Amino acid sequence: MRISPLGIFCWNRDLESTSQFAKQDAALTHPHPVCIQANALFAMAIAQLISSRKSTQETYEDIKVWASELKVEKTLMKAILDAPGSLPADYVSMQGWVIIAFQNALWQLLNAPSLEEGVVDTVMRGGDTDTNAAIAGALLGAAYGRDAVPKQWVEKILSCRPKAGESRVRRPRPECFWPVDAIELARSLTTLGA
């Protein structure tokens, strides 16, 4: 889930560097080979979608090639190959497992009619909804661009100020974690990556 900004940052870098950065990042806290490999593929896909504006189908075909070149684990390759025609079978009992999130994101990339419908469909399937939706949303956002994000979602994010003591705030956050500068952060990532 946290690898998406790295994919944005690497939009103008070669895919090998993007892959290595993503693997190193995953290894810090999620050293399982499947997670490391999925991280690399995901960051590469985001970077390529932003830089090349390839179609979703072309990107999916590239992901298959990259997965073969990386010699990914069988469970990950199966999820990649199954993604165009089927969603994960069980979102709930295996929630939090990268295979579920990755296969879902690929299915949404290839089948969802819009970013909004892909994210909403993901959430409606249950399980680890925030993770799965963040991953699918990042991939769809890279494919369709910032303007594909519903305006009401953007408004909610940019006005979110969960200040302690406010009547409607159940989980206050320090001001440095408020998402009010999310668009500027994304712009900064693309500028730094250039």
What kind of feature is each model-predicted range?
Residues 32, 36, 67-81, 150, ...:
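Short, structured coil/loop segments at alpha-helix boundaries
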Residues 6, 10, 22-25, 36-44, ...:
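Catalytic phosphate/nucleotide-handling subdomain of diverse soluble enzymes
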Residues 3-18, 71:
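All-alpha helical catalytic cores of prenyl diphosphate-utilizing isoprenoid enzymes
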Residues 47-126, 143, 187-193:
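Accessory "access/gating" subregions that flank catalytic or transport cores
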Residues 18-21, 59-64, 153-156:
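Extended, well-ordered alpha-helical scaffold segments
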Residues 1, 16-39, 53, 130:
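Phosphate/ribose-phosphate-bearing ligand recognition and processing surfaces
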